[in-house]
Amino acid sequence: MPRMGGHGAHGGMPGEKAKDFKGTLKKLFKYMGAFKVHMIFVAVFAVCGTVFNIAGPKILGKATTEIFNGLVSKVSGGSGMDFGRIGQILLMTLGLYLISALCSFIQGLIMTGVSQKTTYRLRKEISEKINRMPMNYFDTKPVGEILSRVTNDVDTLGQSLNQSATQLITSVTTIIGVLVMMLSISPLMTLVAILILPISVLLLSFVMKHSQRYFRGQQEYLGNVNGQVEEIYSGHNIIKAFNKEEDVIREFNATNDKLYDSAWKSQFFSGMMMPVMQFIGNLGYVAVAILGGYLTIKNAIEVGDIQSFIQYVRNFTQPIQQVAQVANMLQSTAAASERVFEFLDEAEEDQTVPNPVSVEGLQGNVEFDHVHFGYNPDKIIINDFSAKVKEGQKIAIVGPTGAGKTTMIKLLMRFYDVNSGAIKIDGHNVKDFNRSELRQMFGMVLQDTWLFHGTIMENIRYGRLDATDEEVIQAAKAAHVHRFVQTLPGGYNMELNEEASNVSQGQKQLLTIARAILADPKILILGEATSSVDTRTEVLIQKAMDNLMRGRTSFVIAHRLSTIRDADLILVMREGDIVEQGTHEELLAKGGFYADLYNSQFESTDLTCA
């Protein structure tokens, strides 16, 4: 089954690796420069929250020492425990933890705002970028690949950025702060606790090294699975019509098996990390407890210090694990950022030109002057194409499939630029116009109609957004669609669904004609009336098109030659070249390629009727 793209191609899963990790993060931090003050506040509150949290175990240790000394005193016949002192210590600890929680809440609130504003800005810039991209970019990239950058990659960036930034600050602060507190209790116990670090680092490196390739595989196959699901859904009618269900299921299962294999291995290695780290941490607790007991007997430390130290050891190993997780999240952040910035850095169309030609007052004369073009420079498909079209003329472009008919239209609207030669409107090269102003001169109505989810009124008004309701209705009347709209529930306020399947194919084409009439363009690009409608609707479409073409230069891409007999000029294309041009009668009289095409269509019709 041909690849048609998928929504999930490279969605930025944890562990996906960027090609240029440092460069991408540097670019991301530069991009977030507008939030520099916010990030400073995030860092300050994160550090404060962590410091207050770190002080807690040391103070709790004093409470433990007070309780221990009180018990010993009571056994020895003394005054026993000082509950007032113990209460003061516990209240102080509670206050510290409350302040710590408040600081963490504030930094989390600020960081969430920063990450959401960053993703909002990225989505906005990507959306604007899409409108400035050349058509050949979309012709060479799967739809899902582009959509993934707007959805999956930006979401991944926002989520991982929100988590990794604060996690990194708090983890590093915790490691430094806990190390200082441990040293203040006992340098010897600190040395024993730190000995577990090299083992942890080695194991983490081993796990991360072996999991990376499986994460990349998981990401690749996830994109393939999403792409297959998208094309199966969009083409399910064709699949059923050709009885290809088993082939589709077999292909999907093969890709799904690969995804399962790589996902299982990546998650297995990722899942190994926590149990291994916990085992090493427990070994550290045992060593610290034994050494702490010995030092207490020697009166080198207090009993409460053992309890404080064990808490610090736990707090020391936990941020190390978090740093490892942050490393994974940063990889994910960098990978998603890289893909987003790659798209934002893509070459754009030049939207404006110095001293542009104004479209005001232009009549619609068009000239193709020795045009050469190929989608690939090594394969030219339009060779030395020349033609002159006068304003108001109806020009039919005919030829077999692949002759270059649609390509000529794309060049005329400057979706692509010619390799050599020139296309001129009223003597001005199309390259001398701003693209947006140039395209304002054109209206397009093709057999493949495009209507969006919204009301019928909104769909017609898309031709000119500042049009009044009355102007929209007048355009609909000119397109012979007004009466049909009035029969619908809600009339012009009826909502079309996402595929506009709640109106017929012919009605769709009438609506797009109404849209073009409202736009009032100088030059029209038309497909012939769709052949998949009843005779009455086809007559209405033809009348609407006649109203639309009146007084306008019109290019009609024709397949049924019987529909363009009244054209002022017929351009006959073959393998990218104009091989004949003239009126219908002139071309038939020549008995050339056009006559062969015309006669073959009527021979096919006669055979079908017979």
Predicted regions and their residues:
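ABC-type nucleotide-binding domain
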Residues: 352-353, 359-610
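Alpha-helical segments in transporter systems
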Residues: 37-62, 93, 108-112, 158-173, ...
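Transmembrane helix-loop-helix hairpins at lipid-water interfaces of multipass membrane proteins
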Residues: 39-103, 184-188, 299-303
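Helix-loop-helix
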Residues: 181-195, 265, 269-338, 343-344
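An intracellular "coupling" helix at the cytosolic face of ABC transporter transmembrane type-1 domains
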Residues: 33-37, 135-136, 154-161, 165, ...
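Juxtamembrane loop-to-helix connectors within ABC transporter transmembrane domains
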Residues: 24, 32, 111, 131-176, ...
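Transmembrane helices of ABC transporter permease
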Residues: 34, 38-51, 62, 163-217, ...
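Short intracellular "coupling" helices and adjacent cytoplasmic loop segments at the cytosolic face
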Residues: 11-16, 116, 124-148, 152-154, ...
